[in-house]
Regions:
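Non-catalytic, surface beta->alpha helical segment in thiol-disulfide oxidoreductase systems
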Residues: 339, 351-374
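C-terminal motif of bacterial Sec signal peptides marking the signal peptidase cleavage site
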Residues: 16-17
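Short, internal strand/loop/helix patches
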Residues: 308-342, 346-349
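Conserved redox-active cysteine motifs that mediate thiol-disulfide chemistry
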Residues: 258, 266-283
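N-terminal "domain-start" segment that seeds a small globular fold
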Residues: 221-254, 318, 364-367, 371-372
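Sec-dependent signal peptide recognition
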Residues: 2-11
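A non-transmembrane, solvent-exposed segment enriched in polar/low-complexity residues
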Residues: 20-170
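Conserved helix-turn-beta segment immediately C-terminal to the redox Cys motif
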Residues: 214, 276-298, 368-371
Length: 374
């Protein structure tokens, strides 16, 4: 499938909403271009947020391959322009006219919009990173390490990769910070191009730059509100209080454990990934439990019997609390939980220091802050 190099950016459009703004005039935009291989080409446009999959036909000159479509939009939005079978371009429409050309090799070029120019720059950076001498050498060394089953060498290659990736992500962060405010930046960040925990300060900086007329657009409002929600559990934030009943009905507060490191683990009996991770969590708890460390399991079950059964079956000997309200749990709402398993490590002062700890990452993080059995 041939498409503009949006890579993973359009895979996870968590902020995409194209609901109309109260405006009689709207924004008039013309999408035009030329398809070199015009035989059997059929051009149409579709909004990403259109759950009805309504397509807007675009007139194509069959003899020249030229096409053009003028439309009026009330909001900036994300669209897919279908050009021919298996060929499409993902577009951000906002104020500026856009030109889309397809050459004889079916390569797509998009121009005319600062939002699309930003996407192109990010894609170029990504291509340069993938083909850089450092990455080429890294891939060669990784293949050798795997072929020889050298676990030490494999780990060394992974560490080198993290260093290269950090440098690359810093370049991306600089680009989008400089380009803000921009609808293109919202699209890039919505695709998880930058880790939300490690680069949350970038999300905040971008959100702060959207003000005034920018806030007339629902996409921008949703983005800024999402950043506010993310801040609740951002690393460095004070963990919200938890005050829920344990299996005996006694209420337990997170603040009761101040002075200790506390791993808060959101889970449930019905959650397969949670249950598969529990043996790893048991191993970590048995290794590090002591005066300075505790685990609080927050169950999103609905039935107490199910909750108790899972605790017993998995041998979970730490503190357990639940109001048995599924994702409507007050703790789930306060922590903005929309998927489990989810965990946070909270320091003795109540500050979130790590998140989403699973597998070996859990053990490495606990070793960073604790001594076994301390």
């Amino acid at each position: 499938m041939i498409k503009i190099l949006f890579k993973a950016i359009f895979i996870s459009v968590i902020f995409a909403s194209c609901t109309g703004k109260d405006s009689e005039k709207g924004m008039e935009i013309t999408i035009s271009g030329k398809i070199f291989n015009k035989e059997n080409a059929v051009v149409s446009l579709q909004a990403w947020a259109d759950t009805l999959n309504t397509t807007i036909p675009v007139e194509l000159n069959a003899s020249t391959g030229d096409f053009s479509k003028k439309l009026t939009i009330q909001e900036p939005g994300f669209y897919r322009l279908f050009l021919s079978e298996g060929i499409f371009a993902d577009l951000i429409l906002f104020k500026n006219d856009i030109r889309v050309d397809v050459d004889e090799n079916n390569r797509i070029t998009v121009s005319g919009s600062p939002e699309m120019d930003l996407i192109s720059r990010i894609d170029s950076l990504r291509d340069s990173f993938d083909l850089s001498p450092g990455m080429v050498a890294l891939n060669e060394d990784f293949s050798k390490a795997v072929d020889s089953n050298d676990e030490v060498a494999i780990e060394q290659v992974r560490e080198r990769y993290q260093g290269l990736l950090k440098d690359f992500n810093n370049q991306i962060a600089a680009q989008i910070t400089e380009a803000s405010p921009s609808i293109g930046v919202i699209q890039i960040l919505s695709g998880n191009t930058l880790d939300r925990d490690e680069y949350f300060s970038v999300y905040e900086q971008v959100a702060e730059k959207f003000s005034g007329e920018w806030l007339d657009y629902s996409l921008v409002r949703e983005f800024t509100e999402k950043v506010k929600m993310l801040k609740i559990t951002a690393i460095g934030s004070v963990a919200p209080e938890i005050n829920l009943p344990d299996p005996t009905g006694k209420f337990v507060k997170l603040s009761d454990f101040r002075g200790k490191y506390v791993l808060v683990d959101f889970w449930a009996k019905w959650c397969g990934p949670c249950r598969r991770e529990n043996p790893n969590l048991v191993k970590a708890y048995n290794k590090f439990k002591g005066e300075n460390f505790e685990v609080i399991g927050v169950s999103l079950d609905r039935n107490k019997e199910d909750w108790m059964q899972a605790i017993a079956e998995d041998g979970l000997s730490w503190v357990h609390v639940s109001d048995l309200k599924y994702f409507n749990s007050v703790a789930a709402r306060d922590y903005n939980i929309n998927a489990i398993p989810f965990s946070l490590l909270i320091d003795p002062n109540g500050i979130i220091v790590a998140k989403s700890l699973r597998g070996e990452a859990l053990h490495r993080t606990l070793e960073k802050y604790l001594k076994p059995g301390a």
